[in-house]
Curated annotation (Swiss-Prot):
Keywords: Cytoplasm, Ribosome biogenesis. The lineage of its organism: Bacteria, Pseudomonadati, Pseudomonadota, Gammaproteobacteria, Enterobacterales. PROSITE patterns: RBFA. InterPro entries: KH_dom-like_a/b, RbfA, RbfA_dom_sf, Ribosome-bd_factorA_CS. It is found in: Cytoplasm. One of several proteins that assist in the late maturation steps of the functional core of the 30S ribosomal subunit. Associates with free 30S ribosomal subunits (but not with 30S subunits that are part of 70S ribosomes or polysomes). Required for efficient processing of 16S rRNA. May interact with the 5'-terminal helix region of 16S rRNA. It comes from the Bacteria. This is Ribosome-binding factor A. One of its GO terms (molecular function) is ribosomal small subunit binding. The keyword Zinc does not apply. GO terms for cellular component: cytosol. GO terms for biological process: maturation of SSU-rRNA.
Length: 117
């Protein structure tokens, strides 16, 4: 029973990741957002909240990144509405956008390793 719940959460997370990426790229027409990439989604066990981890390929400044995430957070109601129309869930989770630092940390580690060689 427990593994079925985990598998269901993983499937829902993957589906939310795929659909939110499509919605952002095709329906959110705000040039201030830039080029976001959704690197992962964490859905709570009760399906009430979803943390959407996002990176930006065209932004390096933390202020620009925070501003873009703020814009996405303000559009989260619209994104959630479109998500509800495209998914077969009783309740669609509240979306919380967070910046994913793992890509930058990975680049730093690769640079450090290359300097050691």
């Amino acid at each position: 029973m427990y593994t079925k719940r985990i598998n269901r959460l993983q499937r829902i997370s993957q589906e939310i990741q795929r659909k939110v990426a499509i919605i952002i790229h095709h329906k959110v027409h705000d040039p201030r957002v830039g080029l976001p990439t959704i690197s992962g989604v964490q859905v709570s066990r009760d399906l009430k909240n979803a943390k959407i981890f996002i990176t930006f390929l065209d932004k390096n400044n933390i202020e620009e990144i925070n501003f873009s995430i703020l814009i996405l957070q303000k559009a989260s109601g619209f994104i959630r509405f479109l998500l509800a129309n495209s998914m077969n869930l009783r309740t669609v989770p509240v979306l919380l956008f967070k910046y994913d630092y793992s890509l930058k940390e990975g680049i730093k580690i690769c640079k450090l390793i290359s300097q050691l060689k």
